[in-house]
A protein has these predicted regions:
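FAD/FMN-dependent oxidoreductases across multiple families
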Residues: 4, 24-108, 113, 117-124
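A short, hydrophobic, proline-anchored segment that marks a local hinge/packing element in signaling
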Residues: 7-11
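Short, well-ordered beta-strand elements
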Residues: 14-21
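C-terminal helical "tail/cap" subdomain of flavin- and related membrane-associated enzymes
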Residues: 107-218
Length: 218
């Protein structure tokens, strides 16, 4: 499940790249430039958009850029935003987590300054909450790269309003009510089952059915 980014840098330059499974990249045994060109060729929209583009820098590859600090706080310091961790940007949660954690960090530091004896406890609570939030978004991002996630999330007839629950959390609902929470748990259960037994049509099967028959075959 490759995905592309196109980020305008100015009126004439745009950062363009593709995120792909590292196993696929290694198996292809090609240069980063060749891998990027092959990804463009396999995606009609990107192939069209990049047809007249001029490459002005070298193409390079970088491995897993998600990270998490093992320690979020200490005497007279607290981590927030990208200093605390960074999650795969597929769902664009980075800015949200950075701003939200900054707000929570400010509140935590304010409390610690006003209540020095309880500051360490409040900082530990902050770290637990931030880790919990990053875990939730990392779980979504990891699931995205599986066939079953795409099957379930894009099903023509969504099961139990699961996509709405997922979108609610991806949209910033970090304290979901029970109605959303149980659908999220069901979502992961459905993914587990979908991997083994098709509850909804598999995308690869739908693609095969929609593909035109070879010439001369009826």
């Amino acid at each position: 499940h490759n995905w592309f980014w196109l980020i305008p840098l100015d009126e004439r330059r745009t950062s363009v790249g593709v995120v792909m499974d590292i196993a696929d990249f290694r198996a292809a045994k090609v240069t980063p430039e060749a891998a990027l060109d092959e990804a463009f060729a396999a995606a009609p929209i990107m192939r069209t958009r990049m047809a007249a583009a001029k490459r002005i820098t070298e193409v390079y590859a970088i491995g897993d850029y998600s990270y998490r600090n093992t320690r979020m706080h200490g005497p007279r310091w607290l981590l927030a935003g990208d200093a605390a961790g960074f999650i795969d940007p597929i769902f664009s949660t980075g800015v949200f987590l950075a701003l939200h954690s900054a707000e929570q960090a400010a509140a935590t530091l304010d409390f610690a300054l006003r209540h020095p004896l309880l500051g360490r406890i409040r900082m530990a609570s902050y770290a637990r909450n931030l880790n919990r939030q990053m875990n939730r978004y990392l779980r979504f991002a990891t699931a995205w790269y599986t066939d079953e996630f795409v099957d379930v999330f894009t099903a023509a007839k969504p099961l139990f309003r699961i996509p709405q629950a997922v979108n609610s959390v991806l949209g910033g609902n970090i304290h979901p009510n029970f109605s959303v929470w149980w659908r999220l748990q069901l979502f992961y259960l459905v993914l587990w089952v979908q991997k083994r037994h098709a509850l909804v049509p598999r995308l690869e099967e739908l693609k095969a059915e929609a593909a035109p028959a070879p010439s001369g075959v009826t």
